[in-house]
Design a protein with these regions (language model features):
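Conserved short alpha-helical segments that host acidic/polar catalytic motifs at enzyme active sites
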Residues: 1-201
């Protein structure tokens, strides 16, 4: 299990993000993480919460994390959110789910080009990093999220934070097999693809 939470605000989102993630603490017992975007770019904090509550581990980080856009998670598996820099720009990403065809997707990623993954304990690959690698195979974040939706066998919720979300040429926000909304600076892939962009209600 696990839980994700995101905030898009006109002012500081840090306290809302902190309490929103803490509310999900019952969904996981291993890792907690927060990532915010503000005037100084991205800032992130991840802690092990196996032996102490989320609030205790993150109460000092709240003073240093400044921004009006933020995502975070409680995770039973991999440390996240991850900060990614690629040809699509910089973004933060967090996921919750189970990828049944993970080995197949990793083999395809290796076959498609020069790519590597950070290895976790026990030889496992961070599923969130795999999702980011799938997104980065396309020409826009929107197309990448749609590709994730098509490729993953299993259950996957993706919360993605990008300073600016670009759309592929000629497609607008509506695309086959997905519905879209625009809100804040968060891109979210649920059962249907929902897209959120800054500055729109």
């Amino acid at each position: 299990m696990g839980g994700v939470f995101g905030v898009a605000s006109k002012s500081s989102c840090t306290m809302d993000l902190f309490f929103g993630i803490d509310y999900h603490s019952h969904l996981g017992t291993r890792r907690g993480g927060m990532a915010v975007y503000g005037p100084n770019g991205f800032n992130r904090s991840i802690h092990n919460i196996e032996n102490s509550p989320f609030r205790t581990k993150f109460e000092r980080d709240v003073e240093e994390l400044e921004g009006n856009l933020g995502i975070g998670c409680i995770s039973d598996m991999e440390p996240q959110p991850l900060l990614i820099q690629s040809h699509l720009g910089s973004f933060a990403i967090t996921t919750v789910g189970k990828i049944n065809n993970e080995e197949e997707l990793v083999r395809e990623a290796y076959a498609n080009g020069h790519i590597h993954f950070m290895e976790m304990s026990g030889g496992r690959i961070n599923a969130t990093e795999l999702v980011a690698a799938l997104i980065n195979q396309k020409d826009s974040l929107v197309e990448g999220l749609q590709y994730v939706h098509e490729k993953i066998d299993g259950s996957m919720t993706v919360l993605l934070l990008a300073p600016e979300a670009s759309t592929p040429p000629g497609t607008g926000w509506a695309a086959p097999r997905c519905s879209s909304e625009k809100r804040g600076g968060l891109l979210c892939l649920l059962r249907e693809l929902r897209i959120y962009q800054p500055g729109l209600q």
